[in-house]
Amino acid sequence: MIQRRRPSSGLWKIVVWDEPFFQGKRHEFTTDCYSTPERGFSTVRSFRIESGAWVGFEHCGFQGQQFVLERGEYPCWEAWSGSNAYHVDRMSSFRPITCAVHGRSQLLLFEQENFQGRRGELSDDCPSLPALGWGGSAVGSFLVCSGAWVCSQYPGYRGFQYLLESDTHAGEYKHVREWGSHAQTGQVQSIRRVQQ
């Protein structure tokens, strides 16, 4: 089980609805929701992030495809899944991203798992790793020195998303399996800091 700091209320707020376009049953959260069915929602189909950054998951228990959610409105699934080839029309769990400190973020990426091979360092957003000179489309491991980062499968922040946090796994992501339950490949071609 991942140990994580409990956020204090006021810093994070999400308002959810069980139907698209802010219709149906409504509820506000300021902390983790491990399972929407346990909170009286079969699923969440639209939401508004009022404060903080959040990560939503396809399945209960923070499992499945993940989506980084920053301040704004998400009226339907296209708003949060964007250009993903994998259609996810609902969220079944979500939590705040407590370590998102946009101004002081640092990430080390490695060509191979267990922090081996060629190394790169980022402290700013990178819409295209290949354009930056990173050979190939795969990354083997990450060390998050500070902040929270979202890695995307393709350039331009498209495709599957993988959230990397400095306060999870002590910031160490030694293998693709640690990027999330849906991670199947080390294909990462763009990386950006999470906006708080």
Curated annotation (Swiss-Prot):
Q: Name one GO biological process term.
A: visual perception
| One GO MF term | structural constituent of eye lens
Q: Where is this region: Connecting peptide?
A: 99-104
State the disulfide connectivity: none
Q: Where is this region: N-terminal arm?
A: 1-11
Does the keyword section mention Protein biosynthesis?
no
* Record function comment: Crystallins are the dominant structural components of the vertebrate eye lens.
Under the heading PANTHER family, the entry gives: BETA-CRYSTALLIN A4, BETA/GAMMA CRYSTALLIN
- In which family does this protein belong, per the annotation? Belongs to the beta/gamma-crystallin family.
| Domain statement | Has a two-domain beta-structure, folded into four very similar Greek key motifs.
Its recorded name reads Beta-crystallin A4
Gene source species: Gallus gallus (Chicken)
What does the organism's lineage look like at the top?
A: Eukaryota, Metazoa, Chordata, Craniata, Vertebrata
- Source gene? CRYBA4
